[in-house]
């Protein structure tokens, strides 16, 4: 029997009293990769932020359970400590905080929650250096301030590096392929694939088939008007690439 990581039941959510998510249902099991696709404004990024606990969004109905426990009352920090990871579409810069310090603090916060001892700076330095080849980054990268002056590819690779050290159980990757050239896309995709295992689950939010050329999802979901209107195999993404979204209009009826 598959281990359930995430279950979203009849989820409704709003921001400033504007309804964004309107009856969304989704089950994600351990070992699965799910892709969520849809037009701009369909609610994909909002859904990602809601899973992570973004305070701007109000849940008006439904529930989100993670590892069989409702997380609606948990803060974003508590969700992260439990193993939920969100990669941002537009990662922010944090001047004055080096990557090494940021990553060590995040890693130790997760370890404390797991009942593990904190890593000392030298121990963590060895650990993080062993992870850098995963996303083709050099050790000098760790001395730079978080995302400051980074290229788009470096920002996205930095997020996959974060995912790798946090023992992530549910990764929600919001348009990780956005703004990446072919080489950077391949590096990021290979990093994501290497982190997928039978004990975690990944949700990819994307507009394009090109990311799915590198990472084959077990399920593809189409969002429209705040809910999932169709679910299929990886071939559904190919149909969307070929025909667009208009042929799915009848699914809303």
Swiss-Prot record:
Keywords from the named record: ATP-binding, Chloroplast, Nucleotide-binding, Plastid, Transport
Binding site for ATP: 38-45
Domain ABC transporter: 6-250
A GO molecular-function annotation: ATP binding
Cross-referenced CDD domains: ABC_FeS_Assembly
Pfam families per UniProt: ABC_tran (PF00005)
InterPro entries with a match to the protein in the record: AAA+_ATPase (IPR003593), ABC_transporter-like_ATP-bd (IPR003439), ABC_transporter-like_CS (IPR017871), FeS-cluster_ATPase_SufC (IPR010230), P-loop_NTPase (IPR027417)
Entry-linked Gene3D superfamilies: P-loop containing nucleotide triphosphate hydrolases (3.40.50.300)
Compartmental location: Plastid, Chloroplast
One cellular component (GO) term of this entry: chloroplast
Protein family according to the UniProt entry: Belongs to the ABC transporter superfamily. Ycf16 family.
Protein name: Probable ATP-dependent transporter ycf16
Gene: ycf16
């Amino acid at each position: 029997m598959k281990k359930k990581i995430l279950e979203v039941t009849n989820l409704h959510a709003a921001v400033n009293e504007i309804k964004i998510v309107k009856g969304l249902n989704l089950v994600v099991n351990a070992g699965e990769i799910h892709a969520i696709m849809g037009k701009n404004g369909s609610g994909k990024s909002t859904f990602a932020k809601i899973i992570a606990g973004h305070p701007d969004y109000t849940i008006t109905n439904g529930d989100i359970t993670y590892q069989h426990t409702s997380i609606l009352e948990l803060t974003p920090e508590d969700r992260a400590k439990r193993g939920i990871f969100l990669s941002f579409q537009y990662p922010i810069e944090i001047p004055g905080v080096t990557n090494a310090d940021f990553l060590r603090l995040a890693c130790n916060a997760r370890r404390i929650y797991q009942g593990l001892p904190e890593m000392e700076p030298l121990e963590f330095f060895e650990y993080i250096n062993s992870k850098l080849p995963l996303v083709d980054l050099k050790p000098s990268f760790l001395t730079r301030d978080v995302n400051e002056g980074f290229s788009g590819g470096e920002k996205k690779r930095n997020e996959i590096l974060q995912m790798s050290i946090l023992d992530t159980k549910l990764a929600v990757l919001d348009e990780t392929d956005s703004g990446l050239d072919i080489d950077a896309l391949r590096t990021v995709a290979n990093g994501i694939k290497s982190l997928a295992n039978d004990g975690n689950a990944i949700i990819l939010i994307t507009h394009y088939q090109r990311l799915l050329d590198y990472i084959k999802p077990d399920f593809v979901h189409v969002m429209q008007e705040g809910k999932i209107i169709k679910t299929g195999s990886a071939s559904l993404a190919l149909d969307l690439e070929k025909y667009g979204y208009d042929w799915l209009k009848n699914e809303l009826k």
